Structure formats: C-alpha cells, structure tokens
Amino acid sequence: TMEEIIGSDMHKHLQSAIEDGTYRYCNNNQCSWLIGQDLRYFKPSKPRHKISHIRLAIDDSCNLRCPSCRKSMIFHKEGSAYNLGIRLADKINDWLHNYEHPIQVHIGSDGDPFASHVYRHFMDQTPERDNIKYSILTNALMFKDFAPRVPYVIRNLNELGVSIDGATKETYEKLRLGGRWEKINENLEYISQLKQEHGFRFIMHYVVQKENYHEMEDIIMLGKKYNADRVWLNKMEDWNVFDNFKEMDIFDPEHPLHLDYQERLESIKPYMGFEKKPIVETPTLNIKR
C-alpha cells in the first residue's frame, strides 16, 4: 500500500540523502534542479511530514517510437505489465480517496498518459477532491480526443507539458516516429485554447540532438505561436537505445557540428531573460557566457 511505502525504512533512507545535502542517489548530470544549484551553499529544508507531490511512472506504453527514447513500439493492454499497472493505479487512487492534504499528482514520465490504458484507467477513477491537482507530460497527439473524457483532471490541471522534438514537418516526423505534423499542430491549437479557459501552465519540451539543433529558434517561435509559458531545451541523454549515440551527441566538443551548435545556442540567448517574460529555459544545456 501507499502507507507502507511512505512509512518504510527505504523511504526514510532515501529521504535522508536529501536531508543531509548529499543527494547521493540523484543524477546531477540529468536533474535540472541540481544543475541549477550550488550545493556548497544550499541548505536543504527538513522533509515535510505530509506528501505534497507524487510522480507516476507505472506504464511505458506510448503511441510513438522516438529514436531518442526506445528502439521499438511499447504498448501494454493485456498481460503481466498491464495488470501490474492497473493494480498500482488502483492502490494510488485508493490512497488519494482518503488523503486530506494538498497534493499534486504528475501523470506520465515513462509513457504517454492518453495512449496508455493504465493511465487512462487512473484518470477515469481518480477521486474528485479539491485538494488534488495534476500535472501531465504528453506527446499531445491524442490530447484533443481524450482530454474531454477526463474533465475533472483537466479542470484541476496545474501544468501541461508537451514533448515535441521538431519545429518543422520534416524534422518532427523523422524524430517522432508515428506522429504527424498536422495532427500535433491541431492539438497544440486546442491546448492553447484550453489554457485560456483553465489557466494551466503550458510547457513545451525539446530534446536537442544532431537532427534538430538547427531548429532551436524555430521551436521557440512555435511556442510563442501557441502561447506556451516556457520552452525547455534539454540535452539528449544516452538511454542505450542509440546504436550511433556519438554521432547524434551534438554536445560532444569533438563532434564536427559542435561549434555550429554553440553558435546557434548563443543566438537564442535573448529569449532567455532579456524579455519581461522569458520563454526559454535550458536546464541541461551549456551556454557560453
């Protein structure tokens, strides 16, 4: 149960790694929060007695097979992985039904919430309570079709993140295998309208790599077009799915296109803080100052 997990010795041990300021179980090369901190001067606060945030990663089913994420399609609608996901979703919802304190539930870190039958089940069954808010990360291709089926989640949405690794039809459809450029734009327009109605934060996520680094400014313009609050430009990580990661790793100083990448990165600096409302954040990219 959730109560057993939260009160376990393992939970306390992991929490102690934050309490003592070492963050020894965290990856400081990938965590955007740690990258932005100088831990020599950071004094962590004592852990809260009540849980205020839960991040769900209980199903890796997705309607895309992006080269930066996986080698083949992963989709569960039966079998042991699916059954486990449903059981976990039910246990979490049972706990939320009785939880009295403000909490935010993040849906989708491994698969797509609107493609996944497990996450759909979770959203269908999640309790309607004023203390529960949500955040979602999605590729957005199925958002317009399925968001109306979970109106309570959308009404209580704090933040919607959309992963999109191309700013043109050619690049998008090359890197988001299974996606269509016209479909993503239709959904981005719908999200922009829904944001005005419900007031959630809208974040676009862009994994920078050899095949799309030349469109960094274009994705910023796309974000502006659809009223995004932020465009996050993130470094591509090696998840052991690339046979040619070194070729794609534009961040390697020895890469033949690295200098061009650095020059393009410099050119988008004005979007990062010189506007009244900067739109771009680069938590895992290196910008020369």
Say what each PLM segment does:
Residues 57-59, 78-87, 151-289:
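Radical SAM enzyme [4Fe-4S]-AdoMet core and its adjacent flexible, acidic
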Residues 117-124, 145-152, 215-216:
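Distinct, well-ordered alpha-helical segments
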Residues 48-50, 55-87:
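Canonical Radical SAM [4Fe-4S] cluster-binding loop centered on the CxxxCxxC motif
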Residues 1-4, 34-43, 71-80:
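Iron-sulfur (Fe-S) cluster-binding segments and ferredoxin-like electron-carrier domains
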Residues 98-100, 126-130, 151-156:
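Short, conserved loop/helix-junction motifs that constitute active-site signature segments
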Residues 23-35, 61-71:
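Local cysteine-cluster metal-coordination motifs and their immediate loop/turn environment
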